[in-house]
């Protein structure tokens, strides 16, 4: 299923409930989802108390005229045979190409990165304010004014240093509840290799260790998660 909105099946819900009970998925510091219904429902089962941030660009691929069809439906279609021979790189009729979809998912990765950076910056700022406020309350009034002025002048530089240190020293658990196609596209971007190397079963996924280097993510490790 691609762009068609469809709720989880009863069997799918049971699979996710089993996964939620296992000690595999850690509570995320930040939770991203595809805005499509099946991902919203999946996230609600796996992380019921966690706020989810939808990434519009992480919707499933648009399969166009092939939406909802399987091999038996298409095996006598000449263009479908060409699509298979192209390793799935030809665009779907009335839909997306693999490359278009990868680029869309990459835009979503940039959007998610911005949310991550903003959340870290807020945490750093809150920590700095609390620390500075505690120090200032112990000063006399004239000294407070000087301290407050100095604090404002130094705030941006200190926050940037603290943000860099916080990012490096405190790894965070970030979870994305998305589609199989989205997983393949993102891992193709991050790890290279063939787009179809990263296929997973329903309810499956990958655990990745990533580092943000400038504006690019670097992949340190990759492990498949299965139910």
Which residues does each predicted region cover?
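Short beta-strand scaffold positions
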Residues: 33-34, 103, 177-178
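Phosphate-handling substructures
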Residues: 7, 46-107
């Amino acid at each position: 299923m691609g762009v068609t909105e469809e709720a989880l099946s009863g069997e799918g819900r049971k699979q996710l409930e089993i996964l939620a009970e296992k000690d595999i998925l850690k509570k995320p510091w930040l939770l991203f989802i595809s805005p499509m219904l099946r991902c919203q429902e999946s996230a609600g089962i796996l992380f019921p108390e966690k706020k989810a941030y939808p990434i519009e660009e992480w919707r499933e691929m648009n399969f166009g005229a092939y939406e909802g069809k399987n091999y038996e439906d298409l095996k006598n279609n000449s263009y479908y045979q060409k699509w298979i021979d192209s390793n799935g790189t030809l665009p779907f009729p009335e839909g997306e190409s693999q490359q278009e979809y990868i680029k869309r998912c990459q835009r979503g990765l940039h959007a998610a990165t911005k949310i991550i950076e903003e959340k870290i910056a807020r945490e750093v700022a809150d920590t700095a304010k609390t620390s500075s406020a505690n120090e200032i309350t112990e000063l006399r009034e004239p000294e407070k004014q000087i301290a407050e002025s100095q604090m404002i002048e130094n705030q941006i530089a200190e926050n940037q240093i603290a943000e860099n240190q916080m990012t490096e020293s405190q790894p965070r658990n970030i979870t994305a509840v998305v589609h199989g196609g989205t997983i393949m596209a993102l891992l193709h971007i991050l790890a290279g290799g063939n787009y179809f190397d990263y296929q997973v079963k329903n309810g499956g996924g990958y655990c990745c260790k990533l580092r943000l280097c400038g504006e690019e993510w670097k992949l340190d490790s990759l492990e498949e998660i299965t139910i």
